[in-house]
Regions:
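A generic short-segment signal for beta-strand/edge and adjacent turn/coil regions
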Residues: 1-5, 41-46, 86, 99-104
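Extracytoplasmic juxtamembrane/flexible linker immediately downstream
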Residues: 1-30, 34, 143-148
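Generic alpha-helical secondary structure
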Residues: 2, 6, 49-56, 91-99
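Short secondary-structure junctions
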Residues: 11-20, 66-70, 109-113
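Short, surface-exposed beta-strand segments enriched in small/polar/acidic residues
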Residues: 34-46, 62-95, 116-130
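Extended Gly/Ser/Thr-rich low-complexity repeat segments
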Residues: 44-54, 144-148
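Short, non-transmembrane amphipathic alpha-helical segments
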Residues: 49-66, 100-107
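Periplasmic OmpA/Pal-like peptidoglycan-binding modules at the C-termini of bacterial envelope proteins
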Residues: 92-148
């Protein structure tokens, strides 16, 4: 069940990054990991550290297996610095490039795009938040324009 899924994810993250911070909501339905960006990326770049490949592979396998039983999603939230990027500066913004690299790493390991959600928030902490939660159904979360 859910407790086994959470325990497996905790083992995966804590094995890859021993000082990772984890939190479970009071209802026990969501699990969140908080990781310094420096543990995932090369300094000042959007290049993922080679030592993290197994983390992405193991998380992807765990999420895929769980989603086959219960629709489960992963949200990736990254701090963007003191201000969010402007429309003109999006493609050059480091936080945007980093969240893109994370998504590509998970997609490359087979995680379905429908199970990944991303967000960017202002903040100087330079952390990445990974949240895992159950979706209410297997239905698509969004519809194409015109499908309304």
């Amino acid at each position: 069940g859910l407790a086994v899924f959470h325990a497996k994810l905790k083992r995966v993250y804590e094995t890859a990054i021993p000082l990772v911070e984890s939190r479970v909501t009071t209802k026990g339905d969501q699990l969140q990991f908080i990781i310094p960006q420096s543990q995932l990326f090369e300094d000042g770049r959007d290049v993922l550290r080679d030592t993290r490949k197994e983390l992405f592979s193991d998380v992807s396998q765990t999420l895929i297996k769980r989603s086959g039983v219960v629709p489960t999603d992963m949200e990736i939230l990254i701090n963007a610095g003191s201000e969010l990027p402007t429309e003109d500066g999006i493609k050059d913004h480091l936080a945007i490039r980093r969240v893109h690299a994370l998504v590509e790493a998970f997609l490359g390991q087979g995680t379905p795009a429908r199970n990944i959600y991303v967000g960017i928030k202002p903040g100087k902490e330079k952390k990445v938040y990974f949240k895992f939660y159950i979706r209410n159904s297997y239905d698509n979360q969004f519809s194409k324009v015109g499908d309304q």
